[in-house]
Amino acid sequence: MDLYLKNTTFVIVCFKSQEVIYDCLNTLPKEANKIIVENSNNLNLKKDLESKFNNIEVIINENTGFGASNNLGIKKSKTQFVFILNPDVKFREDTFDNLTKTCRSI
């Protein structure tokens, strides 16, 4: 599983999502890369997330919309696998294992 974690990035687009993003990030595998595209120019959120979570990059972005922001996050990713999440997603303990099993079977 570590090989998959190191080759995985979760891209999350946020706009005034500080009430839910922490719960989302706390359920993701700590070793996986995370790119947060913050569309509300919240510099305090950027600083706080980058100080509390490993393997995270927070991009402060002009609000160009959901699709364009996801594309920006994907372009910034340097991994083989990229998953796009909404900031209110909460992974269960077996979610990532199920995702990797599905990827291997394709």
Question: Where would I find each of the regions flagged by the language model?
Answer:
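Short, well-formed alpha-helical segments that are part of the catalytic scaffolds
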Residues: C14-E31
